[in-house]
């Protein structure tokens, strides 16, 4: 039986989120609805999640000393990493000492903090199907990897980045240096290491939200949400929809792959497993041990959205992954580089039938920064996609003055 306390009292159940962007914000809201005392941590002040949490803290989360000091001072019951750029070795140390429980585990946080750890786990340890790949530390190594078998076209990504930053496709020799430079500029940390992957001519790509939660038997059980289809531009999610139609054999394979990788990572919580699909063939791409940006569509489609599923799972509560309605999401970009933007056209966006708008509250806008998302419901996915994109297009961020 799970016992939950009262926030801001000695009995409080305290959860600390490391990373407080738009995904963390929704997790915090879900936790608060269950009476959890929340601590939102980010590298800058007034991050979206900090605006709704009981406590807001700003530190360099990649600094192990700052991270250790904060966790020891706040004494949370759970620490929930929501981004990759965290001093994960310190989390492993604190978890091993019994200081705190890391979600899903400190090992999972370390392995998934960069593309190398998780790719080697999936392909080399678990034997899961992936694209051909090489890791490279220099432009010369990148060229040698391409010439040595990866070939063209191929995709280059920093080993550590988020939301597709630094990712590009190379169609021929003339694009190699530009791809390397772009990867160096887009990485989360300044070490020059990339993964280059052979290009898979897939039909579509999906996110399979996979939940490890306590079952009725008292044991951890794995459940799957309906597959989410999505469109990415330069590795950054632009729109998503649920459900994505799949051949039954492909769905079975996708679930088997997701089960294998999440079981190895262990712990409890929601995982976003990214997969490429061609006919009945499925390839593993990446996994995040936390809610996924493409999964924001579940705020329109599921009885329990991905954030509620994550909150319930990490607290040891039962979950329900049932689909409620077909739906879609479409990103609202900043469009301008400015502080404290205003949003025109929200009324026009909400006049599109069966739509909702979520504005994240980010204090600073960039042209390609995700500032909000439009959600739409419908009887079918195609109609929902049309509605979501139309609603998103009507929201117009602008600089003040």
From Swiss-Prot:
Binding positions (N(1)-(5-phospho-beta-D-ribosyl)glycinamide): 22-23, 82, 293, 362, 369-370
Xref: PROSITE patterns: ATP_GRASP
Q: Which residues bind Mg(2+)?
A: 274, 286
InterPro entries per UniProt? ATP-grasp, ATP-grasp_carboxylate-amine, ATP_grasp_subdomain_1, PreATP-grasp_dom_sf, PurT, PurT/PurK_preATP-grasp, PurT_C, Rudment_hybrid_motif
> Could you provide one GO biological process annotation from this protein's UniProt record?
'de novo' IMP biosynthetic process
For this protein, the record's SUPFAM superfamilies field holds: Glutathione synthetase ATP-binding domain-like, PreATP-grasp domain, Rudiment single hybrid motif
* Superkingdom classification of source: Bacteria
Q: Which reaction does it catalyse?
A: N(1)-(5-phospho-beta-D-ribosyl)glycinamide + formate + ATP = N(2)-formyl-N(1)-(5-phospho-beta-D-ribosyl)glycinamide + ADP + phosphate + H(+)
KW Signal (keyword) present: no
Q: Which GO terms describe its cellular component?
A: cytosol
> TM spans, by residue?
none
Q: Which family does it belong to?
A: Belongs to the PurK/PurT family.
Mind telling me what this protein is named? Formate-dependent phosphoribosylglycinamide formyltransferase
Q: Which organism is it from?
A: Cupriavidus necator (strain ATCC 17699 / DSM 428 / KCTC 22496 / NCIMB 10442 / H16 / Stanier 337)
Which lineage? Bacteria, Pseudomonadati, Pseudomonadota, Betaproteobacteria, Burkholderiales
The encoding gene is: purT
